[in-house]
Amino acid sequence: VDPDSPTYSQVIHRLEMPGIGDELHHMGWNACSSCFDDGSMSRKYLLLPGVRSNNIHVVDTASDPRAPRLHKVIDGAEIKSKTNLSGPHTVHCLGSEIIISMLGDAKGEAPGGYLHLNKDFDIVGRWENSMGDIKFGYDFWYQPRHNVMVSSEWAAPNTFMPGFDLEEVGHLKYGREIHFWDFEKKVPIETMYLGEDGLLPLEVKFHHDPDSTHGFCGAALSSNVIHWWRDEAGKWQWEKIIDVANEPHPEWPIPVPGVMSAILISMDDKYLYLNNWLHGDMRQYDISDPHNPVLTGQVWMGGLLGKAPEVNGVKMAGGPQMFQLSLDGRRLYVTTSLFSTWDNQFYPEIREQGGVMVQIDCDPENGGMTLNKDFIVDFGQEPNGPSRCHEARYPGGDCTSDIWL
């Protein structure tokens, strides 16, 4: 990623997983700022769950930063037998230990639960004491000073893995609620029903400021941003603050939704970034007033609307999907694959073309974003055939790895 490097914008190493069919999806570190008081901990290991295989790969990124190596594999069959959980998704460290949201039970049915690992990556058991009336799992984020965790909903692995069927939304097989937990007691205590405004409420983010109770959720199918906060009376409130309109398409029987599959907040809590995977745009909003976001930047790349079919000389298959921001808020790296079966359904050409990663240059002082013309990684050119890219992490820290106590 250094423009002065002779291998700028190139793949310099590939680490093959030992199994087949893992589908590496999200990932997270073994340590973050929440274990600042434990001198034995360092950000050395990256945990890569296989959402299909249920295997969790622990990768050593520190011994040789240019050639990460496999440290350990936590077997998915062992996880199932010890916890009755499958479908590993979001990884967060908790002090020196690790919590991973699991989207299903051993048979792939919802709601799943939370896997608890110790710092040696041994299975402790299930983290939660109860799932209450929660129907589905997906993402989670916590604010320890307020003793709160928020979790969101996708669907059961058996529902989302084969592909997306709109009728299953109507059959209530996809989520439309977010949940507030008593973090210390490890039990859900309040549910917010978002209804049509919150279909497929995927990523959830609190402000980085540990004193803040403001947080945000991107509802993928509704293409809305939901804002929540705790009011002066101590009650949790929510509102819809961003609504991306569906767009007409000549080949679609209905207007195309944006499919806002990810959101991100800059480290200073000033900007919120979101994607519209089917439309093909990335957006930047100033959220200095979290009740009234202001659109400050927009970049087009791929998507179904045909506004930017080619980026830096590479034909795009897919749209902006996952993204990660540098700590200084200036470099936003964006990838294009959502989930293999969903990719194949909406962007079938990705099978032959593979995914890409691009860099968007952001202006944290004045707002605004522009596509970097010098950087693109074309994973369609991989030696073992076209590959797809999902989540990115920065070894030195990024904007979704740390939770402050």
Label every PLM stretch briefly.
Residues 1-41, 47-75, 109-110, 118-121, 130-137, 141-290:
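Beta-propeller domains
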Residues 2-7, 58-68, 120-121, 180-186, ...:
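Short loop/turn segments immediately following beta-strands, especially the blade-tip
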Residues 12-29, 71-84, 127-135, 188-199, ...:
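Surface-exposed loop and turn segments in beta-propeller and other repeat-based domains
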Residues 23-43, 84-94, 141-147, 203-211, ...:
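Structural signature of eukaryotic scaffold interfaces centered on beta-propeller domains
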Residues 38-44, 48, 101-110, 152-173, ...:
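Short, conserved, GDST-rich strand-edge loop motifs in beta-rich repeat architectures
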Residues 61-144:
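Asp-box/WD-like beta-propeller blade repeats and closely related beta-sheet repeat scaffolds
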Residues 323-405:
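Blade-level signature of beta-propeller repeat domains, shared across WD40, Kelch, NHL, RCC1
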